[in-house]
Structures are given as structure tokens and as C-alpha cells.
Amino acid sequence: MDSRMSDLQALRGFLGGSERLFVLTGAGCSTASGIPDYRDGQGQWKRKPPIDFQAFMGGQPARARYWARSMVGWRHFGQARPNAAHHALARLAQRGQVDLLVTQNVDRLHQAAGGREVLDLHGRLDEVRCMQCDWRGPRGPWQHTLELANPQWAALQAGAAPDGDADLEGQDFSRFVVPSCPRCGGIVKPDVVFFGETVPRERVQRAYAALEHADAVLVVGSSLMLYSGYRFVQAAARAGLPIAAINLGRTRADDMLALKVSRPCDEVLAEVVS
């Protein structure tokens, strides 16, 4: 039996032996849906790190650059559809094997695939909120507002980047008009957790509560370089739970894993979860 088949057989056994899985997914789970990831096989940045919270809140130039790239990128991101990995994990949940699926992604593709008990750890890109009055709204109308205010930018074409961004280089972002909150005139931000921003406590508590009842942990498409997700794997290891990972390249928790399959998530899960 070759190593590939051996890994798949071992993963089938791992999943078959669990009744209360805690699943943690990252960007690699959505790459087959056409959404790029941030890191290479060594866990290093493939491109410039994303904007951080302080920069976004601290100045109009940073917000103009962010929203220009996001407006152009949303056309691609908003059309992404679940891939075989999302559908396989949804099947596991529908069978009652998944206590909670915690995703670091903001694309809502697990829900689109029919996933149950999904926790969007870092929020969701299909909603926006005001940082002053907490007004909230769907991304569709906000996208329309952005495009009406910036018709010349709306016609631009650019390559897709992670998390709904677009690769726009050499542009004069000072000419991009950033709309304000329709209720109070405040700063509008996507309802996602930026770098430098804290994950809401209730989400973290819900994840830890599910982990206490889990009998195994499955990591899908995450290098675990971000502490926001890595901490749950650390806690699982301390509790003696078996941990498996499907990920191309190294993870921060390689020394904690009972099993690792270094192949694309969609291919592996399509074969293992019938």
C-alpha cells in the first residue's frame, strides 16, 4: 500500500472512531473555491500581510486603499461557491459527528454547503458595521454604494487576493471615495476581525465549551500560525485529545498531531467522506 492510500485509510479510521469532532478550518479549505490563501508551505506570507485594525481606524488613506481593493475583489469573492471539502464536512455534521466547526475563514462557504453548528471565529465578509453606532448591513447594498461613489474604480479588473481583496498596484487611492455610515456618518468596516483586533470573547468561549465535549480534533487547511486558532489545538493536546490535520505544508502544531495528510483538502475529504 502506498503512502497516499495509507494516509487516507488512517484518516478514515480517525474519523470513524470519533462521535464528537471539533473541526477547525482555515484558508486552505477554500482555495479550491478560487479564494487564495495567505501562506506558503512553510507558513510564511506569500504576499504583503493584510491591513491591521490600527491602520484601518487610524487614517483615511488606509481605509481608501482597503475599500478600493475590497470593492474590486468582492465581485470574485462574492461569487465563490463551496467545494468538495465544504460539502464533505457538511455531510459529517449532518451525520451528527461534528459538535462544532470553527472556521477562521470569513467566506460563509461552510454555511452555503449546508454545514451545521458553524462558528465564524473571525466574522463574516458579507456584512458591514459602523464602528461608532454599531449600525450593521449586508455587503450587497454597501457594495452598490461603493460602486456608485467610485464608477471609475468599479470598471477595474484585478487578480483575486485572500479574504475578498484584489491586487491593485500602482493606483492612486487618494482618489477613492469611502462612504460613511448612513446612520451616523461614522467609519464603516467589514464585520470581520482584522489583524490586531480581538476575537469577541463569546466566540472564544463557545469554541472552548465545544472542545470540552469533543473526543477528537480535525484541522483542515490551516497552518495554525495565528494564535486565534492555534490555542484550541494547544488546549486539545493538553487534554489528550487525538488531533489530525489535512494541510499542504507545515503547521505550527506538527509535533502535536496524531495524523497529518499533506494533500489538498478537497481531494482528501472527497475520497474519505462518502
UniProtKB/Swiss-Prot annotation:
Compartments in which it is found: Cytoplasm
Transferase among keywords: yes
Cellular compartments per GO CC: cytoplasm
Obligatory cofactor(s): Zn(2+)
Residues at the catalytic site: 122 (proton acceptor)
Keywords, ordered alphabetically: Cytoplasm, Metal-binding, NAD, Transferase, Zinc
Matching Pfam families: SIR2 (PF02146)
SUPFAM superfamilies on file: DHS-like NAD/FAD-binding domain
Highest taxon above the source species: Bacteria
Main location: cytoplasm
Catalytic activity: N(6)-acetyl-L-lysyl-[protein] + NAD(+) + H2O = 2''-O-acetyl-ADP-D-ribose + nicotinamide + L-lysyl-[protein]
Binding locations of NAD(+): 26-46, 104-107, 221-223, 247-249, 265
Limits of the Deacetylase sirtuin-type domain: 1-274
EC number(s) per entry: 2.3.1.286
Cofactor, how bound (note): Binds 1 zinc ion per subunit.
Binding annotation for Zn(2+): 130, 133, 181, 184
Annotated GO MF terms: histone deacetylase activity, NAD-dependent; NAD+ binding; zinc ion binding
Keyword Metal-binding appears in the UniProt entry: yes
Function: NAD-dependent protein deacetylase which modulates the activities of several enzymes which are inactive in their acetylated form.
Similarity comment: Belongs to the sirtuin family. Class II subfamily.
Protein name: NAD-dependent protein deacetylase
Species for this entry: Bordetella bronchiseptica (strain ATCC BAA-588 / NCTC 13252 / RB50) (Alcaligenes bronchisepticus)
